UniProtKB/Swiss-Prot annotation:
Gene expressing this chain: WAKL9
Enzyme superclass (EC): transferase
Name the UniProt record assigns to this protein: Wall-associated receptor kinase-like 9
Family of the protein in this entry: Belongs to the protein kinase superfamily. Ser/Thr protein kinase family.
Protein origin, superkingdom: Eukaryota
List of catalytic residues: 573
Segments crossing the lipid bilayer: 373-393
Species, as recorded: Arabidopsis thaliana
Taxon lineage: Eukaryota, Viridiplantae, Streptophyta, Embryophyta, Tracheophyta
Signal sequence coordinates: 1-23
Disulfide bonds: 309-320, 342-356, 351-365
């Protein structure tokens, strides 16, 4: 009977044990593997029965934003990652690498408006966790001195400054910056001896606004604090311990780091237990057993176990890791799995072109006959070199042809003559820049259509940006007259000498293209015509003072061209579309495509008639003799445009008043100046100034050139008008001197007949006029011929 009872008890005990083991396996399999996307490997776990001991318990909480966040319960810190020891981390068997990354508050000073100062202390006493040596002390802010506490005998400290030279102090009981510290006594050292100023950049943390110091020594630190010393320097300062120091630099903002509030700290961990039954249940070798078996075995390369454990009974902790050739979780029975080294991962192969055979915890390579492969590779490589050589030869020949073509164009376009001219003018004028075609192609995106500012009958203007950041206008002609290249080069040299704030500057040219290309400074605010007639920006032209200033700027520029430049220059196409407005709405005279230079002993040029209807001097139209007074007449028309806001040619006016000059002269003669003043300025202008300006315009529009004032006189008179003066009666604005009107009647009739036949632009006798309507609305980028017409 007793034997029967004993047998029954034994069966009952066996069934109970099986039930317990089955329940344990089932519980582990039902454990939640992650929290908020962060994997939770054993011995850590969430829920009862899912973690080894209370130290490794993870709670999965819900944040205010609704996301799941894991916390390490024993220290109540948010977890951002848990790692297990792996062979690939380069760890030694007696010190396997395993860590927990947590969020830890940072220390700050003078970063909040209420003056609150925050400290940072991490206390891990009594837990199986310690502060990893992979962490660094980081201090950010000007003249910020930070240090770690509770790390004796070491002194870990650094100082950041905002001077031009770094002063980073890292004190350690080992060796930092050639310093040695033994038992608290510090030797003299040169702090700069190990500094490399070449690494002082914005991507490193080397003492300029940011410094760092490494934790050193082999002792396990479980209480670490961060303090910031008091300094006289004001401003936000932060300091913290982190394993992510590589993401900080001298440009790091302490205020942003303070607002973030935390840093990532790496903690090392081990199995905290005095009962080693768990370690033994894993079936792992101890380090001593592993070394003895491995180095006494005849097959030393083959691992005899998948995991090893460092079981230190004296310190009451143990750490395990998978051996070489295995990977996985060493804290689970059979958790270390064989690595298939023969499987290509990330492009890495162990045997190269040979056959790879996977073994348990190892692999071997079966070598092949490489001769056929070598022959094939040699043939392929030779063919590749041949093809590449042919391609490079083709590219070289193509480049040489292009270079020779550029040289040919440069010589044909007068490049040698330009070089001689530049040599002869050294020290006298600013050197003209000769741009390469490659520079201009890059500046205009290979003359992209998206860069076009405007097009005309003779060429196109592109907007470009040079390598130095300057914005320029690149003028590319469509045609070239090789007979006039010498004259063109002379014009380029002379125009490049012009240095006046109210004249668009010619920056240089390019002669390596089929036709020469001119480069001008870029004027951003369009031309005067757009602002006066197209309501481009009505507010700018709504005041008389702006218009008077523009008139004075134009007069000063033309006066400079006629009398102040090294050789007098006649513009020959003064009109509102050729008056540019810069960013301050100051006038700049542009488009010298038809300009002519004259010697000081000549008073006029005899040329083929060229100009724009409505602005052209009637006397020049009949005689083909262009003088400085011809520019005066054209300026007079622009002056009337500023006063009246009317276009130089308008089909909305009567036949006899179709040209603005005739319309204005008749209004002055009938004493109706007030009626033709632009309505936008009529109420707010000084009538005395408008009247005086109208008198100047009337003088400029005299049909006889000898009775017109010079541009210098016009400029001086407009300057005097701008001076404060009393109001004048409107009737005084009408000039009583109409001398020569009857004698010039025949001239006026000829002009009127020419206008009835014309369409826009005169480049030949009157029978070749083009469209007038197009002339009255053309933009500033209307391109005139790059090469001046032949003088006679």
């Amino acid at each position: 009977m007793s034997s029967y009872n004993s047998f029954s008890l034994w069966i009952l005990f066996s069934l109970q044990l099986c039930f317990i083991l089955d329940s344990a396996d089932r519980t582990v399999s039902l454990c939640q593997p992650d929290c908020g996307g962060i994997k939770i490997p054993y011995p850590f776990g969430m829920g009862k029965g899912c973690y080894l001991e209370k130290w490794y318990e993870i709670t999965c909480n819900t944040s205010t934003s609704g996301k799941l966040v894991p916390y390490l319960s024993v220290i109540n810190k948010e977890v951002v990652g848990i790692s297990l020891p792996t062979e690939g981390r380069g760890s030694r068997y007696n010190n396997p690498y395993q860590s927990v990354n947590i969020k830890n508050p940072i220390a700050s000073k003078e970063c909040s408006s209420n003056g609150e100062e925050l400290g940072s202390l991490l206390n891990l006493t009594g837990t199986p966790f310690y502060v990893s040596q992979h962490n660094e002390l980081v201090a950010v802010g000007c003249n910020n001195t930070a240090s770690l506490t509770n790390v004796k005998p070491s002194i870990v400290q650094c100082t950041s400054s905002c001077s031009t030279k770094p002063h980073t102090h890292i004190k350690d009981y080992l060796a930092v910056l050639n310093c040695q510290n033994y038992n608290g006594y510090e030797k003299n050292c040169n702090e700069d001896s190990s500094m490399d100023e070449s690494i002082m950049d914005e991507t490193s943390c080397n003492g300029i606004g940011c410094c760092n110091a490494y934790m050193r020594g082999g002792s396990i630190q479980q209480i670490v604090g961060v303090t910031i010393e008091n300094t006289i320097t004001r401003g936000c300062k932060v300091a913290f311990l982190t394993n992510k120091a590589e993401y900080l630099s001298n440009k790091s903002d302490p205020q942003k780091l303070h607002a973030r509030g935390y840093s990532t700290v790496e903690l090392g961990w081990f199995i905290h237990t005095t009962n080693h039954s768990f370690i033994k249940s894993l079936g792992c070798y101890s380090v001593k057993e592993y070394n003895n078996e491995r180095y006494t075995s005849t097959q030393r390369r083959i691992n005899i176990t998948s995991c090893i454990c460092d079981d230190n009974a004296y310190l009451s902790y143990a750490r395990c890791s998978c051996t070489r050739g295995f990977q996985g979780n060493p804290y689970r029975l059979g958790g270390c799995k064989d690595i298939n080294e023969c499987k290509e991962e990330e492009g890495m192969t162990y045997c190269g072109t040979n056959k790879c055979v996977n073994l348990q915890g190892h692999f071997k390579c079966v070598y092949n006959n490489h001769r056929p492969l070598a022959i094939g590779l040699g043939a392929s490589f030779g063919s590749l070199i041949f093809v590449v050589g042919i391609y490079l030869l083709y590219k070289f020949i193509k480049k040489q042809r292009k270079l020779n073509q550029k040289k040919k164009f440069f010589k044909r376009n007068g490049g040698l003559l330009l070089q001689q001219q530049l040599i002869s003018t050294v020290g006298m004028v600013e050197k003209t820049i000769v741009f390469s075609s490659r520079e201009l192609e890059k500046a205009t995106e290979n003359f992209s259509s998206n860069r076009i500012l405007g097009q005309g009958g003779q060429g196109t203007v592109y907007k470009g940006m040079l390598v130095d950041g300057r914005i320029v206008a690149v003028k590319k002609s469509k045609v070239v007259d090789e007979d006039k290249l010498e004259e063109f080069i002379n014009e380029v040299v002379i125009l490049s000498q012009i240095n006046h704030r109210n004249i668009v500057k010619l920056l240089g040219c390019c002669l390596e293209t089929k036709v020469p290309v001119l480069v001008y400074e870029f004027i951003p605010n369009g031309n005067l015509f757009e602002h006066l007639h197209d309501e481009f920006d009505e507010n700018i032209m709504a005041t008389w003072n702006i218009r008077l200033r523009i008139a004075i700027d134009i007069a000063g520029a033309l006066s400079y061209l006629h009398s102040s430049a090294s050789s007098p220059i006649y513009h020959r196409d003064v009109k509102s579309t050729n008056i540019m407005l810069d960013e301050k709405y100051r006038a700049k005279v542009s488009d010298f495509g038809t300009s002519r230079t004259v010697t000081v002993d000549h008073t006029h040029l005899t040329t083929v008639v060229s100009g724009t209807v409505g602005y052209m001097d009637p006397e020049y139209f009949q005689s083909s003799q262009f003088t400085d007074k011809s520019d005066v007449y054209s300026f007079g028309v622009v002056l009337v445009e500023l006063i009246t806001g009317e276009k130089s040619i308008s089909f909305l006016r009567s036949q006899e008043n179709r040209t603005l000059a005739t319309y204005f002269i008749l209004a002055m003669k009938e004493n109706k100046l007030f009626d033709i003043i632009d309505a936008r300025i009529r109420d707010g202008c000084m009538l005395s100034q408008v009247t005086a300006t109208a008198k100047v315009a009337r003088k400029c529009l005299n049909l006889k050139g000898r009775k017109r004032p010079s541009m210098r006189e016009v400029s001086m008179e407009l300057d005097s008008i701008r001076m404060p003066c009393g109001d004048m009666q409107l009737q005084e604005c009408v000039s009583e001197n109409e001398e020569g009107e009857e004698q010039n009647k025949g001239l006026v009739e000829d002009i009127m007949r020419a206008e009835s036949r014309s369409k826009e632009f005169v480049t030949a006798p009157a029978s070749h006029y083009n469209n007038i309507a197009a002339a009255s609305s053309s933009s500033w980028s209307d391109v005139e011929p790059l090469f001046p017409l032949q003088t006679r």
